[in-house]
Regions:
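Short acidic/polar capping segments at secondary-structure boundaries
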Residues: 17-23, 40-43, 55, 81-83, ...
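ATP-grasp fold ATP-binding core
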Residues: 4, 27-49, 69-83, 100-104
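Active-site "cap" helix and flanking loop/linker of ATP-utilizing ligase/carboxylase catalytic domains
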Residues: 121-148, 162-217
């Protein structure tokens, strides 16, 4: 957020705190609802929505028990933003914006992720990203979350990831960020790529099933959602599968079936499955340590002795 202030890009009103009294003062200033965030997090972990005093007291107890309120960890307290939740996915070559694709969340899943999304055209976001790329001389991928205000055609940015995230809607709309990232890593030149057709939809059946199970812990809800997806009815009409496209990748039916049968056996397992998936790829508390590591330590290998670091 501080960087956004430096380059003059909008974001919801934000305060910073390291001790609980500062957090309370920030919440009082911003009002409720508001959000409290840790400096690092994945898939909305480390983010808490504070709607009332009970939420705030519960969070204090939780953070105190974890030893996080130690005067060292910085928290970001941010007002709840209005507008439409969207995401951008972009790739740069030494500061030059090569390609960008924006998506709107049509249906929310567990942890705030998108069950189904559609491509949208946001010239103002492209302009903002060109400014970021030039300022940082960014090289590689960048993804950001924002709330779009149609009234004044502005994007209010709330989160950033220095990587590719959920690229399949880009693919169904004509941009393959994964391929571009590989070409860029190999030092190949990539022309600027802007597309005209950006309104195709994509969805994740697994996300849909997990969310259906999490609402009322109902097997019937899970089956109903599976039928809607399979028959492409309702919001899933003209949408393409992004994770388990069984028609093109038949072995993916194994993963889909495993999730479906687990949820039918125990609908309450959905939240646990989602958390387990996040923990498998999240760097979590390791992130602050990375800046102090040597390159060979990233992979547990000592280049000088050719021995694994145990």
């Amino acid at each position: 957020m501080r960087y956004l202030d430096e380059v003059g890009l909008p974001h919801p009103c934000t305060r910073y705190a390291k001790i609980w009294n500062e957090i309370q003062e920030a919440v009082s200033y911003l009002g409720k609802p508001c959000y409290i965030k840790t400096d690092y997090g994945t898939a909305s972990t480390g983010v808490w929505c504070i709607k009332n005093d009970h939420d705030l007291n519960f969070l204090k107890e939780s953070l105190t028990a974890k030893g996080i309120i130690n005067g060292q960890t910085e928290f970001l307290i941010q007002e709840a933003s209005s507008g439409i939740f969207e995401q951008l996915h972009a790739i740069f070559d030494q500061g030059r914006l090569i390609a960008i694709h924006c998506t709107r969340r049509l249906k929310e899943g567990l942890g705030g992720g998108a069950i189904i999304k559609v491509g949208v055209d946001r010239p103002i976001v492209r302009k903002d990203l060109e400014k970021i790329g030039e300022s940082l001389k960014w090289h590689g991928s960048l993804s950001m979350d924002y709330f779009y205000h149609e009234a004044d055609d502005r994007a209010y940015y709330i989160d950033a990831n220095p990587r590719i995230t959920e690229p399949m809607n880009s693919v169904v709309n004509g941009i393959n960020f994964a391929e571009m990232q590989i070409r860029l890593s190999l030092g190949k030149s990539i022309p600027t790529n802007y597309i005209d057709q950006i309104t195709n939809k994509s969805h994740s059946t697994i996300q849909a099933l997990l969310a259906a199970a999490g609402q009322r812990y109902s097997r019937l809800d899970v089956l109903k959602e599976m039928c809607l997806v399979a028959t492409k009815k309702g919001i899933y009409k003209n949408s393409r599968e992004s994770i388990t496209p069984v028609a093109k990748d038949f072995p993916s039916i194994i993963l889909l079936s495993a999730v479906l049968f687990q949820l039918l056996y125990n609908p309450r397992s959905g939240q646990m499955q989602a958390q387990k998936a996040i923990s498998n790829y999240s760097l979590g508390t390791a992130i602050p340590k990375i800046s102090g590591m040597k390159p060979e330590e990233y992979f547990g290998f000592n280049a000088k002795t050719n021995k694994n670091i145990s």
